[in-house]
Amino acid sequence: GITGELSWERIYLYGDTLKNIFGSIGNIPKEDKEIYLNAGYELTDIVGLSYLEMEYEEYLKGTKAKYLVNSDNTLTLIEEEQKGNDLVLSIDIDIQLKVEEIIKEKILLGDSYPNTDYYKDSYALISDPNTGNIIAISGLRRNDDGTWSDISLNTINKSFTIGSAVKGATIAVGYKYD
């Protein structure tokens, strides 16, 4: 007999950089089965399951080729497949990689200071003040075994206490005397 296997793999050009922000892909979740079937998907389709992959699924998915099976079991191409759209981000990958490098350096430097036993993670977000575009977004945690975890999602999913009440006043003065 003949067997077939469907497989897929997402390749991340920069390793774990922004991997969590991009999101994940996989099989259609059971709880969303009807939604996807009504939208023309097949149960074997791979879909975006989180973050950017899920948010922009309808633009990223593309379409499959369509064939006619002839009476002699040959195939006739009826409709070409269409590649999905590319999603262009405002992230500057060179700045992104530099920010990640700086975060790692600063966390490691923290070991040389007293009372930093709990300093295991840091976050950074750089945006263009004129457009609001995000240039770099990063969060890294140093694990107890010395490995690093990407926790970039915390920059948008976690709440933070402000560092100083004076900072708000400083910003307000800056606005007043622009």
Give short role names for the model-derived ranges.
Residues 1-84:
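Small/polar-residue-rich segments within soluble enzyme cores
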Residues 3-5, 20-24, 88-90, 123-127, ...:
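Soluble periplasmic/extracytoplasmic beta-strand elements of cell-envelope proteins
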Residues 31-36, 75-83, 93-166, 173-178:
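Short pre-catalytic segments that frame enzyme active sites
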